[in-house]
């Protein structure tokens, strides 16, 4: 099959705002420096829903969504040297070419090698490997995991432990790695730190896990859905508060609770007003607030400059700061050695035909992560 077109099932998003449609598609063989992967499991993330809603300015249709997946290499194109058929892998939406100025700089993980074409839903050569009913179907985030087979650039693949359960470690392709890395890489919080985590979904829980691993003394969870508090405490939150229970702004509440403010705060929602509250909840002189949530296009953040002049820092993070190709295998190893949790994030398992139900569960707030077996 290596040099042949594969016919398989995929969940196609034909247009914005409509449910995904399970279709038979054709997946072309990998070209030079590309890898064709049989996807075994994928999760559904808020980013997929954001694009499907039509609000994403980079969203293009028709497209195969999905970026939290894991699978087995089916075949490789010419020039691929580090991967072979049969390898167990996680596709990566942030690649690591190892050669661009971003990859060569230890301060960032934002490889730009294929950014332009990836943003257009195309492979690095400017074309697609997917067709359905005679129409070209676009790629998504360089991964397109809502398909039995996908084709990705070889710099967008992490080779992982073949013993890892793919219906669990697929989550390391986005949300868990993002939150965990925000704490241990971006914030680099010290043991004994006091932290506040705004938004207790999957990413927020991963931040809590990272804070706990790093030795935080207090981890305060903040969410308007109190049903999320029990699970947050299981992950390591020492206390949880609901902003709706107070008559004053939540930053004032946190400043009072923590004798002047937290050492580190994390915004895991994508709400610019919450981003401001998270910054202003930080301690004068040294507090650091990390923006993890992705706000809608065109949104702007605001605060009084005095907040920054008096020693607070605003930072952002993407994929938790992990240089992807080299870091994801290590994260899988940390999971296998029980240093980090993954299983506990999975609240629902569905068949491929039920993929639209995964979006419904997410919008209802009833799931952390739903894993779809492909």
UniProtKB/Swiss-Prot annotation:
Its EC number is 1.1.1.1, 1.1.1.-, 1.1.1.284. The keyword Oxidoreductase applies. One of its GO terms (cellular component) is mitochondrion. The modification Phosphoserine is found at residues 247, 324, 351. Its cofactor is Zn(2+). It is an enzyme of class 1 (oxidoreductase). It catalyses: a primary alcohol + NAD(+) = an aldehyde + NADH + H(+); a secondary alcohol + NAD(+) = a ketone + NADH + H(+); S-(hydroxymethyl)glutathione + NADP(+) = S-formylglutathione + NADPH + H(+); S-(hydroxymethyl)glutathione + NAD(+) = S-formylglutathione + NADH + H(+). The modification N-acetylalanine is found at residue 2. Binds 2 Zn(2+) ions per subunit. The record marks 115 as: Important for FDH activity and activation by fatty acids. GO terms for molecular function: alcohol dehydrogenase (NAD+) activity; electron transfer activity; fatty acid binding; formaldehyde dehydrogenase (NAD+) activity; identical protein binding; S-(hydroxymethyl)glutathione dehydrogenase (NAD+) activity; S-(hydroxymethyl)glutathione dehydrogenase (NADP+) activity; S-(hydroxymethyl)glutathione dehydrogenase [NAD(P)+] activity. InterPro entries: ADH-like_C, ADH-like_N, ADH_3, ADH_Zn_CS, GroES-like_sf, NAD(P)-bd_dom_sf. It holds the Pfam family ADH_zinc_N. There are 7 different ADH's isozymes in human: three belongs to class-I: alpha, beta, and gamma, one to class-II: pi, one to class-III: chi, one to class-IV: ADH7 and one to class-V: ADH6. Catalyzes the oxidation of long-chain primary alcohols and the oxidation of S-(hydroxymethyl) glutathione. Also oxidizes long chain omega-hydroxy fatty acids, such as 20-HETE, producing both the intermediate aldehyde, 20-oxoarachidonate and the end product, a dicarboxylic acid, (5Z,8Z,11Z,14Z)-eicosatetraenedioate. Class-III ADH is remarkably ineffective in oxidizing ethanol. Required for clearance of cellular formaldehyde, a cytotoxic and carcinogenic metabolite that induces DNA damage. This is Alcohol dehydrogenase class-3. It comes from Homo sapiens. The gene is ADH5.
């Amino acid at each position: 099959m290596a040099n042949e077109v594969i016919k398989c099932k995929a969940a196609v998003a034909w247009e914005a705002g409509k449910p995904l449609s399970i279709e038979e598609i054709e997946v072309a063989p990998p070209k030079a420096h590309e890898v064709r992967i049989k996807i075994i499991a994928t999760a559904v993330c808020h980013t997929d829903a954001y694009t499907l809603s039509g609000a994403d300015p980079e969203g293009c249709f028709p497209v195969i969504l999905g970026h939290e997946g894991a699978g087995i290499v089916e075949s490789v194109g010419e020039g691929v040297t580090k991967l072979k058929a049969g390898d167990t892998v996680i596709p990566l939406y942030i690649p690591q070419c190892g050669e661009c100025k971003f990859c060569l700089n230890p301060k960032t993980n934002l490889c730009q090698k294929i950014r332009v074409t990836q943003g257009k839903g195309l492979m690095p050569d400017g074309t697609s490997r997917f067709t359905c009913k005679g129409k070209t179907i676009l790629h998504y985030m360089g991964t397109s995991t809502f398909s039995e087979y996908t084709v990705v650039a070889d710099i967008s693949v992490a080779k992982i432990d073949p013993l890892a359960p793919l219906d669990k470690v697929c989550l390391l392709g986005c949300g868990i790695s993002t939150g965990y890395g925000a704490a241990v890489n971006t914030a680099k919080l010290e043991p004994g730190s006091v932290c506040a985590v705004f938004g207790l979904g999957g990413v927020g829980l991963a931040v809590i896990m990272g804070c706990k691993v790093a030795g935080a003394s207090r981890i305060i969870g903040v969410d308007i859905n109190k049903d999320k508090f029990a699970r947050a405490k299981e992950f390591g939150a020492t206390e949880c508060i609901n902003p709706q229970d107070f008559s004053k702004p939540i930053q004032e509440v946190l400043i009072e609770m923590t004798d002047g403010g937290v050492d580190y705060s994390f915004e895991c929602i994508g709400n610019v007003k919450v981003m401001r509250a998270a910054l202003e909840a930080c301690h004068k002189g040294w507090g650091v607030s990390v923006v993890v949530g992705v706000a809608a296009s065109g949104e702007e953040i605001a605060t009084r400059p005095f907040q920054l002049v008096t020693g607070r820092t605003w930072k952002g993070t993407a994929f938790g700061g992990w240089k992807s190709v080299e870091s994801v295998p290590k994260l899988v190893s940390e999971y296998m050695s029980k240093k980090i949790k993954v299983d506990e994030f999975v609240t629902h398992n569905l068949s491929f035909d039920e993929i639209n139900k995964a979006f419904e569960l997410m919008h209802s707030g009833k799931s952390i992560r739903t894993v779809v077996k492909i």
